[in-house]
Amino acid sequence: KDGSLLHADIPDLAYREDSNHRRMHASQIEADDCFYGFGEKSGEINKAEKYMNMAPGDAMGYNAKETDSLYKHIPFYIKLNRGTKQAVGYFYHNTAECDFNMGREKRNYWHRYSTYRTDAGDVDLFLIAGPSIRDIIERYTDLTGKSVMLPKAALGYLGSSMYYPELPENSDDAVLEFIDTTHEEDIPGIGAVGRN
């Protein structure tokens, strides 16, 4: 609305394909841009200067600061410029494994940039104008669908089994202790996610 530039491609790098037929998109970024989203990711919430792999899989040896990648990978993020307070959303409509480089790589020949690279499919990008993060989330969920509110009985605690197999010993006892604790603390709707 105010004439601010929300997005620019990098000339000569914008859309390309490498020798392994992976398709890439390069976007201009600024030093004071912040990047939020990407689905389930560990580490700092602002992913500026981070490299992220997007592939569902078990994260054995999980580290809350650095583990990548986790199960829920969503090729959507919001770029927020700290100076202008302008935000824009990027949704890459592709379910293939991919990765994002959010300015970690710097070159002398081009303006600062981020890259999206997909192992299969096309670069099918939806740019979602702000100006606010709230506006972008509203428009993104208009596009992808909104979650319905679950009944109260379904809003209990859901535990993950990722922690228990990595215990040095007595992992079965730890699971049973967790269940006992939830009963003692009157935590309803206990569920657990795991793999055999």
Explain the meaning of each model-derived region.
Residues 1-167, 171-174, 179-184:
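Catalytic and substrate-binding clefts that recognize carbohydrates or anionic sugar/phosphate headgroups
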Residues 76, 194-195:
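Active-site and adjacent substrate-binding regions of carbohydrate-active enzymes
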Residues 189-191:
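Reverse-transcribing Pol proteins
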